[in-house]
A protein has these predicted regions:
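Bacterial N-terminal signal peptides that target proteins for export
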Residues: 2-13
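Hydrophobic core
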Residues: 14, 18-22
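Sec-dependent signal peptide cleavage junction
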Residues: 22-42
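Residue-level detector of conserved, function-critical positions
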Residues: 35, 39-544
Length: 544
């Protein structure tokens, strides 16, 4: 049923064209250190007005620059490893298979290279592991470093792709693996590699770059270059990488097969690159190794991708499936609208008013007032409480802020003025803020904006934005009782969503005066820097 055998290419490995200069432009340790555009030592030698003791955990974190595209700061524990100028790009690399974050990647200006740019891979000590004399974007998968050229069409089969646009290196051995000619993207799938390739075949190139997928092919090969699968007029995505879920099965790939003219998708399937099983009708990956498929007769199936041997259908619904946690599924009623929560063990069905997905949690608010948060990996109920619907309820907003915490806004109007705002948590917290008191406190400067920031010690904290003197925006941090914890901040928000290695509980991103960084609930800096620090370029010219 809906399964196709993996195409075995009965020919020798596809001829690979690797330019001789590739290996020369890339080298693994030992390496001279990259030119530190903004040496971390300068910041370390400067007087500190912060205490980073709570960060001493050996984990990599990134502080994005204040109001600039570049200029980020990389820390390992309480140690600053790199502070970039505004012209340097830097980011953490999380291995999408292991979930570990042990490296960071930087790209900066270097007039000594042909491209005028250089990039490098660095470990948790700040040591350079790899140096490249060209600009690349990087991803890490099962210890393989996948490099792609950062052009505007890097993930598309445009006509100007060339050898070297995609490179794959094994960090354990330093070996560069074979890559097909004209590859434009690559994802790891189990022990194999899947490539998107520019392959025009007999098609006449369209110089306007329209209908690009008539020139695209998917090729899967062993690490030695032996080709095991080929699909012309197709594109490939990694289930694990595209969902940002380290627990997702890593050997399944989404294959989108296009019409011959590249105008439409004829079929979307999931392919197991290890076993060769291919299942058509793919709709969406949900969680805990389970995905949604549409059958040939139009029903929607929950399919376990991790079952032994081959995938297994768990159950079917007439309506589309929007969310899943072990033991429950949420469907959307096509005919009447609205959601339903299905207990897969008892068969009970609960009408749902709203749902919200967090990083690994599912929150639902039922029409009878039941509010629950499920762990999407285990199915455990983290929060189970009741918030009575208000009289004349028109709509709701449900915000899942992870860890079992959820924030519910109810409206008795159609003009987006919040009527009630309730915070619920895993420790039994169920508190409705006194919005009238908050409005009275801030007067005309308050525009009704409250946003979740952080949780600590069984309490949840939100930010209130309002206009202060000179019409400048200011932010107060309040608890779930509406009490002001910190006042007059220049900014106040949670650490970046889905970021590896979160900050300690009760630590958030803030600006106060000219200082910007990570602050605790006492208003003490855990780490901070001047907001103008990241506004300089490589030559230390500053832009304000």
């Amino acid at each position: 049923m809906m399964k196709q055998n993996l195409l075995r290419v009965g020919c020798a490995a596809l001829s690979l064209s690797m330019a001789a200069g590739l290996l020369a432009s890339c080298s693994v340790l030992p390496q001279p250190s990259a030119p530190a555009s903004r040496p971390a030592q300068r910041e370390q030698d400067a007087p500190k007005n912060y205490d980073a003791a709570s960060l001493k955990d050996g984990k990599l974190r990134i502080l994005y620059s204040y109001n600039a595209p570049g200029g980020n700061t990389i820390l390992c524990g309480d140690t600053v490893l790199r502070q970039s100028p505004i012209t340097e790009t830097s980011y953490l690399l999380t291995d999408c298979i292991t979930g570990e974050t042990n490296y960071y990647f930087c790209q900066w200006s270097d007039n000594s290279t042909a491209s005028g740019r250089r990039c490098g891979l660095f470990d948790k000590t700040g040591a350079e592991v790899l140096s490249l004399e060209a600009p690349y974007d990087a991803a890490l998968s099962g210890g393989l470093l996948i490099l792609t050229t950062p052009t505007s069409f890097a993930d598309s089969p445009v006509h100007d792709h060339a050898p070297g646009d995609v490179r794959v290196l094994d960090l354990a051995t330093g070996e560069e693996l074979p890559v097909p000619e004209n590859a434009y993207t690559c994802v790891a799938a189990g022990d194999r590699l899947a490539f998107g390739i520019y392959a025009p075949g007999d098609a006449v190139p369209d110089e306007e770059n329209d209908d690009l997928y008539q020139y695209s092919a998917v090729q899967i090969q062993e690490r030695d270059g032996t080709v095991v699968y080929r699909n012309d007029h197709a594109a490939v995505l990694s289930v694990a990488l595209s969902n940002g879920d380290a627990s997702a099965p890593t050997d399944w790939l989404e294959i989108d097969t296009y019409s011959d003219d590249g105008m439409s998708i004829e079929q979307t399937s999931l392919l197991n690159a290890t076993t060769g099983e291919e299942r058509s009708g793919f709709v969406v990956y949900l969680s805990a190794g389970v995905a949604s498929f549409q059958s040939e007769n139009g029903t929607y199936q929950l399919v376990d991708l991790t079952s032994t041997g081959q995938s297994e259908v768990l159950c079917e619904f007439e309506d589309s499936i929007s969310a899943y946690a072990p033991g429950v599924a949420v469907t959307y009623r096509q005919d009447l609208g609205g959601y339903e929560l299905h207990d897969l063990n008892t068969g009970d069905v609960l009408e749902v008013r709203d749902e919200s997905l967090g990083t690994d949690t599912l929150a639902v608010y039922a029409k009878d007032g039941a509010l629950r948060v499920y762990d999407q990996n285990t199915g455990a109920v983290l929060t189970d409480t009741v918030v009575t619907p208000i009289e004349g309820l028109q709509r709701t907003d449900l915000y899942n802020v992870d860890g079992g915490w959820v924030w519910l806004r109810q409206y008795d109007n159609d003009y987006y003025e919040v009527t009630t705002s309730t915070v619920c948590g895993p420790n039994g917290t169920n508190k409705t803020l006194d919005l009238d008191a908050i409005k009275a406190r801030y007067g005309a400067g308050f525009h009704g904006y409250l946003w979740p920031v952080t949780a600590a010690g069984g309490e949840f904290y939100l930010s209130v934005s309002y206009q202060g003197p000179g019409q400048n925006w200011l932010y107060d941090l309040i608890d779930s009782n509406g009490n002001v914890v910190l006042a007059g901040l220049g900014s106040c928000n949670g650490y970046y969503t889905n970021t590896a290695n979160p900050l300690p509980d009760g630590v958030f991103v803030a600006r106060k005066g000219f200082e910007y960084g990570w602050m605790d609930l006492h208003g003490q800096w855990i780490y901070c820097q001047n907001i103008f620090y990241s506004s300089g370029d490589d030559a230390e010219n500053y832009y304000f």
